[in-house]
C-alpha cells in the first residue's frame, strides 16, 4: 500500500445475511475487515434479481428490511467499535451486475419501482437520489454470465480491479485479463475507476480503494470517485493511484 493512502475501504463485499453465496454474516465480515486493517467497508449484497437468499414472496417493505440486515447489524457493530460500515448493493441483470452506492433502506422502501427498472431506468432513479452506478467486473466470464454486455451511457464508472481475478487467495474467477479489459474500457470512456475484492467470506484479499483521509459518508465516497480525486486502487497485492492507472499503457 502506498503509505500516504492509509485509509483503505472494501467497496465490494457480500454477507450470508442476504447473499446466497455469502459464507459469513455482516458482523463477522466487519470484524475481519477491522482486524485486517481496513478503515471501513461497503456491504454490497446481491439484490432481488441477483444471487439473493431473502424470501421473494415477502411484502416489499419487509423484504427490504431483511435484505438490509447484514448491513444494519454490521453498522451497529461498527458504531460501537470505531469502524466505518457503509451501505450499497449489487444489482443483477441476468448476469450483468452493477454496484449501487448512495441510497439506503428508506429509499428502497419508498421506490419499489427500482425492483423492475431497466438498466436505463436504474441509472435515472439512482441519479435522482444522488447516488452512483458502477459496472462491476464488466468483462468477467462465467457460466452465470450469458454474455458480456456494456452500458457506457448508463453507468458512472467501472470496477477496474476486482481482486478475485488476480489475488492469490482467490479461489474463483481467476483471470487477470478480466481486469485488463475493464481498465481499457474505463480509459476509453474516461470513466472513474474503482477497485474491490468481491469477497464472500472472512478470507479477505485486502483489495479496495484507499484515500489519504477518512471518508465521511457514502456521499463523500461518491463525490471523490466521480471527481476522480486523489485515491489509490489495490487488489491486495499491488497498489496504483488513479492518476497512474489513467496514464498506464496497456498492451493490445
Predicted regions and their residues:
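Charged catalytic cores and adjacent phosphate/nucleic-acid-binding surfaces used
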Residues: 1-11, 15, 26-31, 94-108, ...
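An N-terminally biased module of ancient metal coordination in phosphate/nucleic-acid-related enzymes
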Residues: 1-93, 201-203
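Well-ordered, non-membrane alpha-helical segments in soluble/globular domains
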Residues: 61-74, 115-120, 173-180
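Conserved beta-strand positions in the central sheet of alpha/beta enzyme cores
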Residues: 42-43, 134-135, 159
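Glycine-rich tight-turn/loop motif centered on a GG-T
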Residues: 60-61, 106-112
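Internal catalytic-core helix/loop-beta-alpha segment
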Residues: 112-142
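Flexible loop residues that form catalytic
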Residues: 46, 138, 163
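Short, solvent-exposed loop/turn segments at secondary-structure boundaries
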Residues: 19-24, 55, 110-113, 170-173
